Amino acid sequence: MTLSFTAHWRDELPATYTALLPTPLKNARLIWYNDKLAQQLAIPASLFDVTNGAGVWGGETLLPGMSPVAQVYSGHQFGVWAGQLGDGRGILLGEQLLADGSTLDWHLKGAGLTPYSRMGDGRAVLRSTIRESLASEAMHYLGIPTTRALSIVTSDTPVQRETQEAGAMLMRLAQSHMRFGHFEHFYYRREPEKVQQLADFAIRHYWPQWQDAPEKYDLWFEEVAARTGRLIADWQTIGFAHGVMNTDNMSILGLTIDYGPFGFLDDYDPGFIGNHSDHQGRYRFDNQPSVALWNLQRLAQTLTPFIEIDALNRALDRYQDALLTRYGQRMRQKLGFFTEQKDDNVLLNELFSLMAREGSDYTRTFRMLSHTEQQSASSPLRDTFIDRAAFDGWFDRYRARLRTEAVDDALRQQQMQSVNPAVVLRNWLAQRAIDAAEQGDMAELHRLHEILRQPFIDRDDDYASRPPEWGKRLEVSCSS
Protein backbone atom coordinates (compact mmCIF):
# COMPACT_ATOMS: atom_id res chain seq x y z
CA MET A 1 0.00 0.00 0.00
CA THR A 2 1.30 3.46 -0.94
CA LEU A 3 1.28 6.13 1.74
CA SER A 4 -0.66 9.23 0.77
CA PHE A 5 0.12 12.68 2.16
CA THR A 6 -1.75 15.94 1.96
CA ALA A 7 -0.97 19.48 3.09
CA HIS A 8 -4.14 21.01 4.51
CA TRP A 9 -2.22 23.22 6.94
CA ARG A 10 0.14 24.53 4.28
CA ASP A 11 -2.62 25.09 1.73
CA GLU A 12 -5.25 26.64 4.00
CA LEU A 13 -3.28 28.64 6.59
CA PRO A 14 -0.53 30.42 4.64
CA ALA A 15 0.22 32.99 7.36
CA THR A 16 1.04 30.38 9.99
CA TYR A 17 4.29 28.81 8.81
CA THR A 18 7.57 29.00 6.96
CA ALA A 19 8.28 26.35 4.33
CA LEU A 20 11.70 24.74 4.70
CA LEU A 21 13.53 21.42 4.60
CA PRO A 22 14.97 19.45 7.52
CA THR A 23 18.72 19.62 8.13
CA PRO A 24 20.07 16.05 8.35
CA LEU A 25 22.39 14.86 11.10
CA LYS A 26 25.89 13.44 10.66
CA ASN A 27 25.97 9.66 10.30
CA ALA A 28 22.32 9.35 11.35
CA ARG A 29 20.97 5.89 12.07
CA LEU A 30 17.58 4.48 13.06
CA ILE A 31 17.68 2.89 16.53
CA TRP A 32 13.99 2.28 17.26
CA TYR A 33 10.68 2.33 15.49
CA ASN A 34 7.13 1.65 16.59
CA ASP A 35 6.31 -1.57 14.76
CA LYS A 36 2.73 -1.84 16.05
CA LEU A 37 1.84 1.73 15.13
CA ALA A 38 3.50 1.33 11.75
CA GLN A 39 1.36 -1.74 11.06
CA GLN A 40 -1.81 0.07 12.09
CA LEU A 41 -0.99 2.92 9.70
CA ALA A 42 0.00 0.56 6.87
CA ILE A 43 3.50 2.02 6.72
CA PRO A 44 5.61 -0.31 4.55
CA ALA A 45 8.26 -2.19 6.52
CA SER A 46 10.72 -1.35 3.75
CA LEU A 47 10.75 2.29 4.90
CA PHE A 48 12.41 1.18 8.12
CA ASP A 49 15.00 -0.92 6.30
CA VAL A 50 17.58 1.83 6.10
CA THR A 51 21.16 0.58 5.98
CA ASN A 52 22.67 3.69 4.42
CA GLY A 53 21.62 6.76 6.39
CA ALA A 54 18.29 7.30 8.11
CA GLY A 55 15.92 8.11 5.25
CA VAL A 56 12.78 10.03 6.06
CA TRP A 57 13.28 9.29 9.78
CA GLY A 58 16.37 11.50 9.76
CA GLY A 59 15.01 14.15 7.41
CA GLU A 60 17.30 13.00 4.60
CA THR A 61 14.48 12.22 2.19
CA LEU A 62 10.81 13.11 1.85
CA LEU A 63 7.95 10.85 0.89
CA PRO A 64 5.77 11.80 -2.09
CA GLY A 65 3.23 14.44 -1.12
CA MET A 66 5.16 15.79 1.88
CA SER A 67 5.42 19.60 2.07
CA PRO A 68 7.51 20.50 5.15
CA VAL A 69 6.72 23.60 7.21
CA ALA A 70 7.68 25.05 10.58
CA GLN A 71 4.68 26.54 12.36
CA VAL A 72 4.62 29.89 14.13
CA TYR A 73 2.78 30.44 17.40
CA SER A 74 3.17 32.47 20.58
CA GLY A 75 2.31 31.84 24.21
CA HIS A 76 2.41 32.46 27.91
CA GLN A 77 5.32 30.69 29.63
CA PHE A 78 5.19 30.30 33.41
CA GLY A 79 2.30 32.76 33.43
CA VAL A 80 4.16 35.50 31.54
CA TRP A 81 3.57 36.58 27.94
CA ALA A 82 6.57 35.33 25.97
CA GLY A 83 5.67 36.69 22.54
CA GLN A 84 6.48 34.82 19.36
CA LEU A 85 7.67 31.23 19.77
CA GLY A 86 7.04 28.58 17.11
CA ASP A 87 8.59 25.32 15.95
CA GLY A 88 12.17 26.04 16.93
CA ARG A 89 13.45 22.53 16.26
CA GLY A 90 10.53 20.68 14.72
CA ILE A 91 9.14 20.51 11.19
CA LEU A 92 5.71 19.30 10.10
CA LEU A 93 6.67 17.10 7.16
CA GLY A 94 3.14 16.39 6.01
CA GLU A 95 -0.25 14.98 6.90
CA GLN A 96 -0.87 11.31 6.21
CA LEU A 97 -4.27 10.74 4.64
CA LEU A 98 -5.98 7.83 6.40
CA ALA A 99 -8.62 5.47 5.03
CA ASP A 100 -11.47 7.22 6.88
CA GLY A 101 -10.57 10.59 5.37
CA SER A 102 -8.88 11.95 8.49
CA THR A 103 -5.25 13.00 8.59
CA LEU A 104 -2.27 12.42 10.85
CA ASP A 105 0.59 14.90 11.23
CA TRP A 106 4.13 13.62 10.76
CA HIS A 107 6.27 16.01 12.80
CA LEU A 108 10.05 15.58 12.86
CA LYS A 109 11.52 16.86 16.11
CA GLY A 110 15.19 17.87 16.13
CA ALA A 111 15.08 18.67 12.41
CA GLY A 112 17.39 21.69 12.53
CA LEU A 113 17.22 25.46 12.64
CA THR A 114 14.01 27.25 11.68
CA PRO A 115 13.09 30.95 11.67
CA TYR A 116 11.57 30.30 15.10
CA SER A 117 14.63 28.78 16.79
CA ARG A 118 15.39 32.05 18.61
CA MET A 119 18.64 31.37 20.52
CA GLY A 120 18.40 27.59 20.10
CA ASP A 121 20.28 25.24 17.79
CA GLY A 122 17.25 23.49 16.29
CA ARG A 123 18.33 20.13 17.63
CA ALA A 124 17.05 17.48 19.99
CA VAL A 125 19.28 15.07 21.89
CA LEU A 126 19.08 11.32 22.33
CA ARG A 127 18.04 11.69 25.97
CA SER A 128 15.00 13.86 25.22
CA THR A 129 13.84 11.85 22.22
CA ILE A 130 13.98 8.61 24.20
CA ARG A 131 12.02 10.19 27.06
CA GLU A 132 9.32 11.49 24.72
CA SER A 133 9.01 8.21 22.84
CA LEU A 134 8.63 6.26 26.07
CA ALA A 135 6.25 8.75 27.68
CA SER A 136 3.91 9.16 24.75
CA GLU A 137 3.63 5.41 24.20
CA ALA A 138 3.19 4.79 27.93
CA MET A 139 0.35 7.32 28.03
CA HIS A 140 -1.29 5.78 24.97
CA TYR A 141 -1.36 2.33 26.53
CA LEU A 142 -2.69 3.83 29.77
CA GLY A 143 -5.62 5.14 27.71
CA ILE A 144 -4.72 8.83 27.96
CA PRO A 145 -4.98 11.08 24.87
CA THR A 146 -1.50 11.80 23.56
CA THR A 147 0.75 12.36 20.61
CA ARG A 148 2.50 9.18 19.44
CA ALA A 149 6.11 8.26 18.72
CA LEU A 150 6.99 6.49 15.48
CA SER A 151 10.80 6.46 15.34
CA ILE A 152 14.08 7.60 16.89
CA VAL A 153 17.28 8.41 15.02
CA THR A 154 20.63 9.06 16.70
CA SER A 155 23.77 10.46 15.13
CA ASP A 156 27.37 11.62 15.48
CA THR A 157 26.32 15.29 15.52
CA PRO A 158 27.41 16.80 18.85
CA VAL A 159 24.80 18.96 20.59
CA GLN A 160 25.64 21.08 23.62
CA ARG A 161 23.20 21.01 26.53
CA GLU A 162 24.34 20.75 30.17
CA THR A 163 26.98 18.48 28.62
CA GLN A 164 27.76 17.50 25.04
CA GLU A 165 25.24 14.94 23.80
CA ALA A 166 24.35 13.11 20.61
CA GLY A 167 21.94 14.86 18.25
CA ALA A 168 18.79 12.87 17.57
CA MET A 169 15.40 13.08 15.85
CA LEU A 170 11.96 11.85 16.84
CA MET A 171 9.09 11.31 14.42
CA ARG A 172 6.00 12.39 16.34
CA LEU A 173 2.49 11.70 15.10
CA ALA A 174 -0.72 13.46 16.09
CA GLN A 175 -4.12 14.21 14.63
CA SER A 176 -3.08 17.84 14.92
CA HIS A 177 -0.34 20.01 16.41
CA MET A 178 -2.69 22.99 16.74
CA ARG A 179 -1.99 24.72 20.06
CA PHE A 180 -3.58 27.42 22.18
CA GLY A 181 -0.53 29.46 21.22
CA HIS A 182 -1.50 29.53 17.54
CA PHE A 183 -4.56 31.58 18.45
CA GLU A 184 -2.64 33.80 20.85
CA HIS A 185 -0.10 34.64 18.16
CA PHE A 186 -2.58 36.33 15.84
CA TYR A 187 -4.72 37.80 18.59
CA TYR A 188 -1.77 39.74 20.00
CA ARG A 189 -0.75 40.74 16.48
CA ARG A 190 -4.23 42.29 16.22
CA GLU A 191 -5.23 40.01 13.36
CA PRO A 192 -8.60 38.63 14.57
CA GLU A 193 -9.53 37.43 11.09
CA LYS A 194 -6.62 34.96 11.25
CA VAL A 195 -7.73 33.77 14.70
CA GLN A 196 -11.11 33.03 13.16
CA GLN A 197 -9.45 31.25 10.24
CA LEU A 198 -7.72 28.95 12.73
CA ALA A 199 -11.06 28.18 14.39
CA ASP A 200 -12.64 27.54 10.99
CA PHE A 201 -9.78 25.19 10.10
CA ALA A 202 -10.19 23.27 13.36
CA ILE A 203 -13.94 22.90 12.90
CA ARG A 204 -13.62 21.95 9.22
CA HIS A 205 -11.07 19.21 9.83
CA TYR A 206 -11.72 17.95 13.38
CA TRP A 207 -15.38 18.79 14.04
CA PRO A 208 -16.96 18.81 10.55
CA GLN A 209 -20.39 18.01 12.00
CA TRP A 210 -20.60 21.62 13.22
CA GLN A 211 -19.53 23.41 10.03
CA ASP A 212 -23.03 24.60 9.17
CA ALA A 213 -24.29 25.16 12.72
CA PRO A 214 -25.09 28.82 13.52
CA GLU A 215 -23.44 28.38 16.92
CA LYS A 216 -20.46 26.42 15.57
CA TYR A 217 -17.84 28.50 17.40
CA ASP A 218 -19.65 28.16 20.73
CA LEU A 219 -19.93 24.39 20.30
CA TRP A 220 -16.30 24.12 19.27
CA PHE A 221 -14.81 26.05 22.18
CA GLU A 222 -17.04 24.22 24.63
CA GLU A 223 -15.68 20.93 23.30
CA VAL A 224 -12.08 22.19 23.50
CA ALA A 225 -12.71 23.08 27.15
CA ALA A 226 -14.36 19.73 27.89
CA ARG A 227 -11.54 17.76 26.27
CA THR A 228 -9.01 19.73 28.28
CA GLY A 229 -10.93 18.99 31.47
CA ARG A 230 -11.05 15.27 30.77
CA LEU A 231 -7.35 15.22 29.92
CA ILE A 232 -6.36 16.92 33.17
CA ALA A 233 -8.56 14.51 35.14
CA ASP A 234 -6.75 11.63 33.46
CA TRP A 235 -3.39 13.13 34.42
CA GLN A 236 -4.43 13.62 38.04
CA THR A 237 -5.81 10.12 38.48
CA ILE A 238 -2.83 8.36 36.90
CA GLY A 239 -0.33 10.52 38.81
CA PHE A 240 1.21 12.36 35.86
CA ALA A 241 2.86 15.77 36.15
CA HIS A 242 3.51 17.44 32.78
CA GLY A 243 6.07 19.89 34.11
CA VAL A 244 5.72 22.75 31.63
CA MET A 245 2.07 23.63 30.96
CA ASN A 246 2.73 26.78 28.96
CA THR A 247 -0.08 27.82 26.62
CA ASP A 248 2.03 26.85 23.62
CA ASN A 249 2.14 23.30 25.04
CA MET A 250 -1.66 22.97 25.20
CA SER A 251 -3.40 21.01 22.44
CA ILE A 252 -6.68 22.16 20.91
CA LEU A 253 -7.64 18.48 20.64
CA GLY A 254 -6.99 17.73 24.30
CA LEU A 255 -3.84 15.67 23.68
CA THR A 256 -0.83 15.38 25.95
CA ILE A 257 1.88 17.09 23.92
CA ASP A 258 5.49 18.23 24.35
CA TYR A 259 6.97 15.80 26.86
CA GLY A 260 9.89 17.48 28.59
CA PRO A 261 10.36 17.65 32.37
CA PHE A 262 7.42 15.33 33.07
CA GLY A 263 7.22 12.83 35.87
CA PHE A 264 4.92 10.12 37.17
CA LEU A 265 4.48 10.23 40.93
CA ASP A 266 6.64 7.86 42.94
CA ASP A 267 5.77 8.79 46.53
CA TYR A 268 2.37 10.45 46.75
CA ASP A 269 3.21 14.13 47.00
CA PRO A 270 0.48 16.50 45.81
CA GLY A 271 3.04 19.30 45.64
CA PHE A 272 5.38 17.30 43.38
CA ILE A 273 7.38 19.51 41.00
CA GLY A 274 8.85 17.59 38.08
CA ASN A 275 10.68 20.48 36.43
CA HIS A 276 13.69 21.68 38.41
CA SER A 277 13.44 25.01 36.54
CA ASP A 278 9.97 25.61 38.03
CA HIS A 279 11.24 27.45 41.09
CA GLN A 280 7.82 28.80 42.12
CA GLY A 281 6.04 25.47 41.67
CA ARG A 282 3.56 26.87 39.17
CA TYR A 283 3.27 23.52 37.41
CA ARG A 284 3.32 21.30 40.48
CA PHE A 285 1.09 18.24 40.36
CA ASP A 286 -1.85 19.57 42.38
CA ASN A 287 -1.89 22.89 40.52
CA GLN A 288 -2.42 21.38 37.07
CA PRO A 289 -6.24 21.74 37.08
CA SER A 290 -5.98 25.44 37.94
CA VAL A 291 -3.27 26.08 35.36
CA ALA A 292 -5.30 24.39 32.62
CA LEU A 293 -8.25 26.65 33.43
CA TRP A 294 -5.96 29.70 33.36
CA ASN A 295 -4.66 28.59 29.97
CA LEU A 296 -8.21 28.15 28.67
CA GLN A 297 -9.00 31.67 29.85
CA ARG A 298 -6.07 32.94 27.77
CA LEU A 299 -7.44 31.05 24.77
CA ALA A 300 -10.95 32.40 25.44
CA GLN A 301 -9.58 35.93 25.33
CA THR A 302 -8.37 35.38 21.76
CA LEU A 303 -11.87 34.30 20.71
CA THR A 304 -13.72 37.39 21.95
CA PRO A 305 -13.94 38.93 18.44
CA PHE A 306 -16.38 36.20 17.34
CA ILE A 307 -17.71 34.43 20.47
CA GLU A 308 -19.92 36.21 23.01
CA ILE A 309 -18.60 36.52 26.57
CA ASP A 310 -21.53 34.51 27.99
CA ALA A 311 -20.76 31.62 25.63
CA LEU A 312 -17.08 31.73 26.56
CA ASN A 313 -17.96 31.62 30.25
CA ARG A 314 -20.31 28.67 29.69
CA ALA A 315 -17.46 26.82 27.99
CA LEU A 316 -15.11 27.56 30.89
CA ASP A 317 -17.76 26.20 33.25
CA ARG A 318 -17.88 23.14 31.02
CA TYR A 319 -14.18 22.61 31.71
CA GLN A 320 -14.85 22.43 35.45
CA ASP A 321 -17.80 20.08 34.93
CA ALA A 322 -15.85 17.77 32.62
CA LEU A 323 -12.84 17.73 34.94
CA LEU A 324 -14.82 16.92 38.08
CA THR A 325 -17.05 14.37 36.35
CA ARG A 326 -14.15 12.50 34.77
CA TYR A 327 -12.05 12.69 37.94
CA GLY A 328 -14.90 11.29 40.03
CA GLN A 329 -15.52 8.47 37.56
CA ARG A 330 -11.85 7.53 37.37
CA MET A 331 -11.25 7.61 41.11
CA ARG A 332 -14.34 5.51 41.80
CA GLN A 333 -13.04 2.98 39.28
CA LYS A 334 -9.64 2.99 40.97
CA LEU A 335 -11.31 2.31 44.32
CA GLY A 336 -13.59 -0.38 42.90
CA PHE A 337 -16.85 1.54 43.32
CA PHE A 338 -19.59 0.98 40.76
CA THR A 339 -21.98 3.55 42.21
CA GLU A 340 -21.54 7.09 43.48
CA GLN A 341 -22.15 7.74 47.17
CA LYS A 342 -21.93 10.98 49.10
CA ASP A 343 -19.02 10.01 51.36
CA ASP A 344 -16.78 8.67 48.59
CA ASN A 345 -14.67 11.83 48.49
CA VAL A 346 -14.19 11.68 52.25
CA LEU A 347 -12.88 8.12 51.99
CA LEU A 348 -10.59 9.04 49.09
CA ASN A 349 -9.19 12.11 50.83
CA GLU A 350 -8.54 10.09 54.00
CA LEU A 351 -6.49 7.66 51.91
CA PHE A 352 -4.58 10.50 50.26
CA SER A 353 -3.82 12.00 53.68
CA LEU A 354 -2.47 8.67 54.88
CA MET A 355 -0.38 8.25 51.73
CA ALA A 356 1.05 11.76 51.92
CA ARG A 357 1.94 11.33 55.58
CA GLU A 358 3.69 8.02 54.98
CA GLY A 359 5.23 8.75 51.57
CA SER A 360 3.31 5.86 50.05
CA ASP A 361 4.01 4.94 46.46
CA TYR A 362 1.08 6.23 44.38
CA THR A 363 1.00 3.55 41.69
CA ARG A 364 1.78 0.58 43.94
CA THR A 365 -0.77 1.62 46.59
CA PHE A 366 -3.68 1.56 44.15
CA ARG A 367 -2.41 -1.58 42.43
CA MET A 368 -2.18 -3.43 45.74
CA LEU A 369 -5.58 -2.10 46.77
CA SER A 370 -7.05 -3.65 43.63
CA HIS A 371 -6.31 -7.11 45.08
CA THR A 372 -8.51 -6.45 48.14
CA GLU A 373 -10.90 -9.22 49.14
CA GLN A 374 -14.10 -7.81 50.59
CA GLN A 375 -14.43 -10.35 53.37
CA SER A 376 -10.78 -10.30 54.43
CA ALA A 377 -9.64 -7.87 57.12
CA SER A 378 -6.02 -8.36 56.05
CA SER A 379 -4.33 -6.70 53.11
CA PRO A 380 -0.78 -6.82 51.76
CA LEU A 381 -1.08 -3.04 51.57
CA ARG A 382 -1.10 -2.88 55.37
CA ASP A 383 2.57 -3.81 55.56
CA THR A 384 3.52 -0.72 53.55
CA PHE A 385 2.19 1.62 56.28
CA ILE A 386 4.01 2.52 59.48
CA ASP A 387 0.85 3.75 61.21
CA ARG A 388 -0.99 0.43 61.05
CA ALA A 389 -3.80 1.62 63.32
CA ALA A 390 -4.61 4.52 61.01
CA PHE A 391 -4.57 2.22 58.00
CA ASP A 392 -6.73 -0.39 59.75
CA GLY A 393 -9.34 2.25 60.55
CA TRP A 394 -9.45 3.44 56.97
CA PHE A 395 -9.44 -0.10 55.57
CA ASP A 396 -12.41 -1.09 57.74
CA ARG A 397 -14.39 1.87 56.39
CA TYR A 398 -13.30 1.03 52.87
CA ARG A 399 -14.45 -2.61 53.13
CA ALA A 400 -17.75 -1.43 54.58
CA ARG A 401 -18.18 0.78 51.51
CA LEU A 402 -17.39 -2.16 49.22
CA ARG A 403 -20.13 -4.19 50.89
CA THR A 404 -22.71 -1.64 49.71
CA GLU A 405 -22.00 -2.68 46.13
CA ALA A 406 -23.82 -5.65 44.60
CA VAL A 407 -20.63 -6.79 42.92
CA ASP A 408 -18.48 -9.81 43.67
CA ASP A 409 -14.74 -9.64 44.33
CA ALA A 410 -13.74 -11.04 40.95
CA LEU A 411 -15.59 -8.43 38.92
CA ARG A 412 -14.49 -5.57 41.15
CA GLN A 413 -10.86 -6.67 41.12
CA GLN A 414 -10.99 -7.01 37.35
CA GLN A 415 -12.23 -3.43 37.02
CA MET A 416 -9.68 -2.07 39.46
CA GLN A 417 -6.80 -3.91 37.81
CA SER A 418 -7.84 -2.50 34.42
CA VAL A 419 -7.42 1.11 35.62
CA ASN A 420 -4.69 0.82 38.28
CA PRO A 421 -1.47 0.09 36.38
CA ALA A 422 1.30 -2.09 37.73
CA VAL A 423 3.83 -0.20 35.61
CA VAL A 424 4.21 3.49 34.78
CA LEU A 425 7.16 5.26 33.21
CA ARG A 426 9.06 6.25 36.31
CA ASN A 427 11.91 8.65 35.60
CA TRP A 428 14.50 6.15 36.78
CA LEU A 429 13.29 3.53 34.30
CA ALA A 430 13.62 6.04 31.47
CA GLN A 431 17.05 7.07 32.73
CA ARG A 432 18.28 3.48 32.80
CA ALA A 433 17.28 3.05 29.16
CA ILE A 434 18.91 6.38 28.27
CA ASP A 435 22.18 5.52 30.02
CA ALA A 436 22.42 2.25 28.10
CA ALA A 437 21.47 3.86 24.79
CA GLU A 438 24.12 6.54 25.20
CA GLN A 439 26.65 3.69 25.42
CA GLY A 440 25.28 2.17 22.22
CA ASP A 441 23.11 -0.51 23.86
CA MET A 442 19.49 -0.18 22.69
CA ALA A 443 18.22 -3.40 24.28
CA GLU A 444 16.77 -1.71 27.37
CA LEU A 445 15.01 0.92 25.24
CA HIS A 446 13.30 -1.80 23.23
CA ARG A 447 12.53 -3.88 26.33
CA LEU A 448 10.99 -0.94 28.19
CA HIS A 449 8.82 -0.04 25.21
CA GLU A 450 7.47 -3.60 25.17
CA ILE A 451 6.73 -3.54 28.91
CA LEU A 452 4.95 -0.19 28.71
CA ARG A 453 2.56 -1.70 26.17
CA GLN A 454 1.14 -3.91 28.95
CA PRO A 455 0.88 -1.62 31.99
CA PHE A 456 -1.98 -3.48 33.66
CA ILE A 457 -0.23 -6.84 34.02
CA ASP A 458 1.28 -7.65 37.44
CA ARG A 459 5.04 -8.02 37.49
CA ASP A 460 7.48 -9.17 40.15
CA ASP A 461 10.54 -7.44 38.68
CA ASP A 462 11.89 -3.94 39.17
CA TYR A 463 9.75 -2.41 36.41
CA ALA A 464 6.89 -2.45 38.92
CA SER A 465 8.94 -1.59 41.99
CA ARG A 466 9.66 1.61 43.84
CA PRO A 467 12.73 3.48 42.58
CA PRO A 468 16.17 2.61 43.95
CA GLU A 469 17.93 5.29 45.97
CA TRP A 470 19.73 6.71 42.94
CA GLY A 471 16.44 6.95 41.06
CA LYS A 472 14.53 9.01 43.60
CA ARG A 473 13.82 12.65 42.75
CA LEU A 474 15.83 12.65 39.55
CA GLU A 475 16.13 16.21 38.30
CA VAL A 476 14.75 16.87 34.84
CA SER A 477 14.54 20.16 32.96
CA CYS A 478 13.12 21.54 29.73
CA SER A 479 16.13 20.10 27.87
CA SER A 480 14.92 16.67 28.99
From Swiss-Prot:
Cofactor: Mg(2+); Mn(2+)
Pfam family, one: SelO
Positions of the catalytic residues: 248
Binding site for ATP: 86, 88-89, 109, 121-122, 172, 179, 258
Positions annotated to bind Mg(2+): 249, 258
UniProt keywords, alphabetically: ATP-binding, Magnesium, Manganese, Metal-binding, Nucleotide-binding, Nucleotidyltransferase, Transferase
Catalytic activity: L-seryl-[protein] + ATP = 3-O-(5'-adenylyl)-L-seryl-[protein] + diphosphate; L-threonyl-[protein] + ATP = 3-O-(5'-adenylyl)-L-threonyl-[protein] + diphosphate; L-tyrosyl-[protein] + ATP = O-(5'-adenylyl)-L-tyrosyl-[protein] + diphosphate; L-histidyl-[protein] + UTP = N(tele)-(5'-uridylyl)-L-histidyl-[protein] + diphosphate
Entry's EC annotation: 2.7.7.-, 2.7.7.108
GO molecular function: AMPylase activity; ATP binding; magnesium ion binding
UniProt cross-references to PANTHER family, sorted A to Z: PROTEIN ADENYLYLTRANSFERASE SELO, MITOCHONDRIAL (PTHR32057:SF14)
Family according to the record: Belongs to the SELO family.
Stored NCBIfam families: adnlytase_SelO, PRK00029.1
Primary role: Nucleotidyltransferase involved in the post-translational modification of proteins. It can catalyze the addition of adenosine monophosphate (AMP) or uridine monophosphate (UMP) to a protein, resulting in modifications known as AMPylation and UMPylation.
Annotated protein name in UniProt: Protein nucleotidyltransferase YdiU
